[in-house]
Swiss-Prot record:
This is Outer capsid protein P8. It is found in: Virion; Host cytoplasm. GO terms for cellular component: host cell cytoplasm; viral envelope; viral outer capsid. One of its GO terms (biological process) is fusion of virus membrane with host plasma membrane. It comes from Wound tumor virus (WTV). It comes from the Viruses. Transmembrane segments: none annotated. One of its GO terms (molecular function) is structural molecule activity. Capsid protein which self-assembles to form the outer icosahedral capsid with a T=13 symmetry, about 70 nm in diameter and consisting of 780 molecules capsid proteins. Keywords: Capsid protein, Host cytoplasm, Outer capsid protein, Virion. Signal peptide: none annotated.
Amino acid sequence: MSRQNWVETSALVECISEYIVRSYGDTFIGLTSTDLSTLSNLLSNLSIANVGFLNDLRTPLQNMSNEFVDFLSTTDRCGFMLRPIWFDSDINPAVTDNFVNSYIKLRNSVPVSDVIRQVNNLSLHNDVVLKIYSVQNAIIRALDPPYGTKVDPTNLFRATALKPSNYGQRRSLCTQLGAGVEAVDFFVSERGRMVFGRRSPNALQAAQYDINVPNFWSVLDVTNARVYFTNTFLGCTITNVQVNAQNGQNPVAFIRVNTDQNDINVDSDAIVSFSLAGGVINVTTAVPMTGFAIAIEGDFHFQMNRCQSYYTGVSITLGAQVPIDDFGIMKHLEIFRMRLLACGQAEMFAESMNRLTMQLIANYTQDNFNPNAVAFATPWYRISERFGVILSFIDQNINLQTRRLMVRHLWVIYSFIAVFGRYYNIN
């Protein structure tokens, strides 16, 4: 079955699961006959004539999860899903697999966007935040994730050979600069805030200083933000910065971004919102300072229409320390992982995921792949580190673009595991 059919069906599973959990509580593990009328009303409201995997409304979601795990655990059954052609096209191959025929039948109904729009109707749900379908489309088609969803900037950091990792800068920021060393700019993030500035062993004159915003953060907006001087990062003291400069009753400094030509005072109680799209933050100091560190603390979001180049290509760089789980898919795998442990199936599924991943890599590299070059030191559900291995294992025949496609392809399969595996229970 085509990639997009999988995505649309998983979006429908996500919608129905959210609806039932909200209606019946977190203890729900499957459909029973008592759920039929409620679910039938929901499907009627969605104008869905053929609901794919729920053709028989008495089919428990638990059975669906069990079938999916069995399907995914055998690479000759899910082999088409592991091929580049599955990701790149919407063809509909002839399938004979029981799981696909029984539960993921093609939906000749309203498009998934209309399904989502109607499911999110306030008359049906007053506070539902659906979690996975939007980022599936963001990864696959470079569509935008929801702008109301907060983004943790620390998840977006991209280390490169010439630029250290985000948390890896802590030690250097805490180490005094030597005498005669030129001023050094920095831009880091911890949960809920960004910290940027210029460290200097000598006094910096009152002037304008341009601090470059890393490209992986230039796709963000910040709302409900406060801007202030600081000298800490991850609980440690940043050296060679001054935090308590005085200028009487006047501001010590203000910042300005290219997308907003209004001054934003530093150390103010003002609550501000602005975009980092300009790529540069201008810092104007009113008094000499021995370096400065400025924090932006607020709610970060993706800018509208800026996701296209973000996740689907240019931001994924070569290296083992590249975090890839930007949209937090790993936390959605925990429900399934706990069910695997409870059923005693964790090791078996881990072996299946290793085989699946190796087969996917081999499909993208054809005859050039050396399986001995890939060694996963972390379990299957720690996807950021696994993706880092894919981006960094030594094989001169595999270029960065191919590695990016592998990561994106595997991310979508993980999203299906998070959706279809949430009710797994073999007992």
